[in-house]
Amino acid sequence: MNYRFTTLLASTAGAIAALAATAAFADDTTTPAATPAAAPAAAPAAPSPAPYPAMSASLAANAPPLTFDLGILGSKVTIGGVLSGYGQAQSNPVFNGSTGKTDQKSTIDLSNAQLFINKSDGVIQYFVQVGAYSLPNLSDLPYTGSSKAPAADFGNLPQGFLKIVPNSVFSFEIGALPTLVGDEYTFTFENLNVERGLLWGVEPAVSRGVQGNATFGPLAISVAWTDGFYSNKYNTISGLATWTINATNTLAFDFQTPTDKQNVITSITSPVLNNETIYNLMYTTTVGQFLINPYLQYTSVSGNTVVGYGKEESWGAALLVNYAFDAKSALAGVSIPFRVEYMSTQGTEVNAPNVLYGPGSNAWSFTVTPTYQFKQYFIRAEASYVTASKVITPDGYGFSGDKNSQVRGIIETGVLF
């Protein structure tokens, strides 16, 4: 761990600890009982968390968030964050090319030490996310710890953008943007499960560029021009349309495609993903205590003679479900999310690119993540299982990449504020 990272991590963690303590104190401090009023006042509206980063249903950000008057930077700037630790054990660890050894069977790490700064009022708004993180996901790639993940992925300022909101219909964003594509977010705390799934592995996570948004009644539309898979080549268009059918049902469609071929290779991605076209169809419904979210995915990678590979297609389907126990029950704060996925690739071993466990491979996954949150504090356990067929060595699991399955057990615990 180099000095710059150590300094940043120490300062970020210190700031997070101080803010978390402030939030916890504010949450736990009681005041003397007031003199009863002649008549009860109407109940105030429930406080809302900051708009960014986005969160799934199993964890909730602190509400209301800590708000500060920062003068020229805004009089209602909210500052929040997450500090969390992560422990993992796995079967069939894969070969780690950076160390020349097999990936560790067990790992203890810092999964998040991040601060979030939001200004979400007025015409000029902004969001800044800063800190350290790791990005565990279901794949045949070795785990990259939080001391190295920012340098290998999106830096210590992974997301940050300026947002112009001229009216209630239109808005515009520029900067490092969360992707419009897919049904899972980038960071562990944002999702139902700690690890992102198989389908997430072929989706962009953060893209740099510009984005326009419009809302027309129940229909919300966003279109972006970006560098796609963080390639630093601005040749990719993406879009998202979301139809809010009613209070409990939404239907969404997204896509991303490059406008021309590219041969960019970075630590984050490759020409395979940089030249990928992807579509997702997603439906979300709430039934009682259940949130049910199925989605379908299709990807296509066109041949690239410069890099030397042919065409590859993939089809995927996933079902994400969360059951949250009633807030009035003895198990208030407990939820049980799970995810089931299937992904199939169409390609030949000769020259097709690899987007799974070798050209022509397919895989199933099952992940369950019992979760408990009390105020800002949370803990969740996770068990995941992946089994693949038509695995091409060395793209599978194990030291030689010839194994077709992996089991993982994970604990993540921390504080959101």
Summary of predicted features, one role per range:
Residues 63-96, 100-238, 242-251, 326, ...:
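Outer membrane beta-barrel
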Residues 3-5, 29, 37, 41-44, ...:
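Outer-membrane beta-barrel pore domains
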Residues 1-95, 417:
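N-terminal periplasmic/intermembrane-space "pro-region" immediately following the signal or transit peptide
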